Amino acid sequence: MKLYPAIDLLNGKSVRLTQGDYDQVSLTEDPLYQAQRLTDAGFAHLHLVDLDGARAQRPINRRIITRIREQTSAFIELGGGIRTLAAMEIYLTIGIDRLIVGSAAVSDPDLVEQAIARFGSNRIAVGIDTRAGKVATNGWLTTSQQTANALLTAMQQRGVTTFIVTDIAKDGMMQGPNAQLLADLQQAMPQATIIASGGVSSLADLRRLQTAGIQAAIIGKAWQTGAIELAMLKQMEG
C-alpha cells in the first residue's frame, strides 16, 4: 500500500487540525524536522497542505515548501490555495511532483482541464473533501451542493485520474476512515486512483482500506502522535 505521511502548514509550522477547524490546532512542530524524519525513515511520498493558502485562496507557505523540497528527494504532492495556472507553474518549477486542486475543481472546472492539458494528468490531482455527503471548499469553510460522486465523475471526464478523498467528519478524529464512502467511489470509478485521507488511526484501518479496494492513504495525526510507529507504517507500505 502506498502511504503519504502528511505535513499541514499553518503560519510556517506543522500543525494538526480536528475536522478542519482552524480553531482546533494541535501538535505544532517544525515541518523541516518532520520532513527529514520521514525521509530518514524511508518514506518515498509526502503529502503537504498549505492551510493558510487554503483559507486565503492563494499560496502562502511557499518559502517553507521550497525548503522542504530542497531537503528531500521524496515524491511531494501539495494542496491548499492552488487556484491559478501561474501558482501551479511556480510550484512545479521548484520541483513539487503533484498538485492537488480542491475548491477550484468546483468553482472553475475548466482550470483543471487546462492544467492537465498543460502539465499532464500525472501532475494534477483533485481533492474531494466531503461533509455530510456534499463537497466542502475554501479550506472546508464552505459547503457546496455538489456530491462527491458527481464531482469525481465530472473531473474524470475532464481527464483527472487521481483523487484525494477526505470525509471531514473523520479528519483528525483518530476513529477510522469512512471505508464505505471510499469503497463506493472506487467501485463506481474503477479506473480512478483514489487516495484515502482522514481518520486513519491504526494498521487495522489501513487493512480495511485495502479490503475496500483502496491502495493509497494519507496518514496525519496517527504518525505525528505516535499512534502508529513509523517503522510499522513503513512495514505496511512494503
Swiss-Prot record:
- Enzyme active site: D8, D129
Q: Name one GO molecular function term.
A: 1-(5-phosphoribosyl)-5-[(5-phosphoribosylamino)methylideneamino]imidazole-4-carboxamide isomerase activity
Q: In which pathway does it act?
A: Amino-acid biosynthesis; L-histidine biosynthesis; L-histidine from 5-phospho-alpha-D-ribose 1-diphosphate: step 4/9
Query: What is the enzyme's class at the highest EC level?
Result: isomerase
* PANTHER family, A to Z: 1-(5-PHOSPHORIBOSYL)-5-[(5-PHOSPHORIBOSYLAMINO)METHYLIDENEAMINO] IMIDAZOLE-4-CARBOXAMIDE ISOMERASE
Q: Name one Pfam family in it.
A: His_biosynth
Instruction: Specify the protein name.
Output: 1-(5-phosphoribosyl)-5-[(5-phosphoribosylamino)methylideneamino] imidazole-4-carboxamide isomerase
Organism, as annotated: Lacticaseibacillus casei (strain BL23) (Lactobacillus casei)
Keyword set, alphabetical order: Amino-acid biosynthesis, Cytoplasm, Histidine biosynthesis, Isomerase
Q: List the GO terms this entry assigns under cellular component, sorted alphabetically.
A: cytoplasm
Enzyme Commission designation: 5.3.1.16
UniProt family annotation: Belongs to the HisA/HisF family.
The protein's annotated catalytic reaction(s) are: 1-(5-phospho-beta-D-ribosyl)-5-[(5-phospho-beta-D-ribosylamino)methylideneamino]imidazole-4-carboxamide = 5-[(5-phospho-1-deoxy-D-ribulos-1-ylimino)methylamino]-1-(5-phospho-beta-D-ribosyl)imidazole-4-carboxamide
UniProt main location, coarse: cytoplasm
Signal peptide positions on this chain: none
Location in the cell reads: Cytoplasm
Q: Which Gene3D superfamilies match?
A: Aldolase class I
- Gene Ontology BP, a term: L-histidine biosynthetic process
